[in-house]
């Protein structure tokens, strides 16, 4: 879940409360997004807040219909280095989402920028599923392959969408206070597994 495509192991979690802001959605969707983020934080043992003392908002989510729109967002190139090159790659890949992270001096997540091009695939998810999925994916620096073939969510028999139990357990283990906020050694997975086993 945390092994990069180049074979390196990189784990990072938030080192501060998450202060979200969402752009490009209607009020009812905004409420759903923020509720999902709060729910995932509670499940992980982390917390949200209204304002980050340094950044104001530290989890910024942008919804739009075309990657080209990003080039016109004021000062976005200051948050996303080489913005034009990033947009070019996303357009070429026909991607529908992109996440960029910033880290503090300890290597913990300091900020996360989420960009969602709302195509047919994302529209079919529905607001609740999309919100929950994006909240989960913003909690760690997941590998590029983590959810490529399997969603972090599962639909129950009653139609409710929830986190897969193993993902919820991984969040709780990763945010355990005794665990590091940053790890670059694959042995970290053994510590995560041990925390999950103890919790069960």
Whereabouts are the PLM-identified features?
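Disordered inhibitory propeptide/activation segment of secreted metzincin zinc metalloprotease zymogens
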Residues: 1-14
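Short, non-transmembrane amphipathic alpha-helical segments
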Residues: 32-46
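PEST-like low-complexity, intrinsically disordered acidic/proline/serine-rich tracts
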Residues: 44-48, 69-76, 86-87, 192-200
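Acidic helix-start/capping segments at beta-turn-to-alpha-helix junctions
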Residues: 50-70
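Surface-exposed short loop/turn segments
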Residues: 67-133
């Amino acid at each position: 879940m945390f092994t990069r495509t180049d074979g390196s192991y990189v784990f990072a979690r938030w080192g501060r409360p998450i202060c979200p802001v969402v752009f490009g959605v209607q009020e009812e969707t905004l409420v759903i997004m923020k509720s999902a983020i709060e729910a995932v934080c509670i499940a992980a043992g982390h917390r949200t807040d209204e304002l980050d003392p340094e950044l104001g908002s530290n989890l910024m989510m942008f919804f739009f219909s075309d990657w080209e729109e990003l080039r016109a967002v004021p000062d976005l190139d200051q948050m996303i280095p080489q913005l034009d090159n990033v947009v070019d790659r996303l357009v070429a890949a026909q991607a529908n989402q992109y996440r960029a992270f910033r880290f503090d001096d300890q290597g913990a997540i300091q900020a996360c920028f989420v960009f969602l091009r709302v195509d047919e695939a994302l529209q079919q998810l529905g607001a609740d599923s999309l919100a929950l999925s994006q909240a989960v994916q913003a909690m760690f620096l997941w590998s590029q392959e983590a959810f490529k073939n399997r969603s972090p969510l599962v639909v129950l028999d009653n139609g409710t969408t929830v986190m897969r139990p193993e993902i919820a357990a991984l969040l709780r283990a990763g945010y355990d206070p005794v665990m590091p906020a940053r790890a670059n050694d694959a042995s970290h997975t053994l510590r995560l597994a041990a925390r999950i086993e103890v919790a069960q």
